[in-house]
From Swiss-Prot:
Cofactor(s) annotated in UniProt: Zn(2+)
Enzyme nomenclature, EC number: 4.2.1.1
Keyword Cytoplasm: no
Name this polypeptide is given: Beta carbonic anhydrase 1
């Protein structure tokens, strides 16, 4: 806590005045362009590596950047009472956000734990909120990791029953560069996108092309940021060489000229 208090003092001396001016501007012209679901890991600093300013982006953080799937496909009688679906409704239905980004990372402690629980089921603690959270929301990701480890770096299908337009294919770690846990982390990003697509209140937005779901991944070891390319079916590092093709893909897949879709995502992540 002393570190936090000292940090507030430095904030008061060096940052507060400029930040208050930004708050004043945003209060008159709020224009967030995306909502990002990312991990609570202290090494993950999404506003840093996206260079986002005040008012640019909603950020929702939890263990493992997970978004619970809707409890029943097509059911209007049941509501998933969780922070994440509520945040989606706030951002998309009420805030008119058109881009949702799920961002995972390497050496994710939540993914490491999920993998360990699968390797040794007896470690599962029924009284642990963490274990229950991971098992409930990471089960499909774990199934897909098993498939990936069995078939190797081949095409895998991610299919949405509620919003078929959101289905896609992916090749996870084609160069066999990452550990099983990091493969799981990348798979989990894509599976959480599928989970988002299960929510009926988003179906019309998705099917009409008014909402776009993106997968990103951060390598904490070298600071590189990756974006999932549906064209290439893999995570692609964002750098000067790949920006033109990634931007072109986003502009084609996210035809929203009023907010320059390709620029929104790439500029936020690059």
């Amino acid at each position: 806590m002393n570190r936090i208090i000292r940090g507030v003092i430095q904030y008061n001396q060096k940052i507060k005045a400029g930040l208050v001016k930004q708050f004043e501007h945003v209060s008159d012209h709020p224009n967030p362009t995306a909502v990002m679901f990312t991990c609570m890991d202290s090494r993950m600093l999404p506003t840093r590596f996206t260079q986002s300013a005040v008012g640019d982006m909603f950020v929702v953080r939890n263990a493992g950047n997970m978004i619970p799937a809707a409890p029943n496909y097509g059911s209007y009688s049941e509501v998933s009472i969780n922070t994440e679906p509520a945040a989606l409704e706030l951002a998309v239905k009420r805030g008119k956000i058109r881009h949702v980004v799920v961002c995972g990372h390497s050496d994710c402690k939540a993914m490491n734990t999920l993998y360990q629980l699968h390797q040794c089921p007896t470690k599962f603690d029924v009284s642990s909120p963490m274990d229950q959270w991971l098992r409930r929301n990471g089960f499909e990701s774990m199934k897909k990791l098993n498939e990936r480890l069995h078939i190797g770096p081949k095409t895998m299908k991610f299919e949405s029953e509620v919003a078929p337009s959101q289905s896609f294919e992916a090749i996870i770690d084609p160069m066999e560069k990452w550990s099983a846990e990091d493969k799981l982390s990348q798979i989990n990003v894509l599976q959480q996108i599928m989970n988002i697509s299960t929510h009926e209140f988003l179906k019309d937005y998705l099917e009409a092309g008014n909402l776009h779901l993106h997968g990103a991944w951060f390598n904490i070891y070298d600071g590189e940021v990756f974006l999932f390319s549906k064209d290439r079916k893999r995570f692609v590092v964002i750098d000067e060489k790949t920006v033109p093709s990634l931007s072109a893909e986003l502009e084609r897949r996210c035809p929203l000229p009023e907010d320059k879709a390709g620029d929104v995502v790439i500029q936020n992540l690059h």
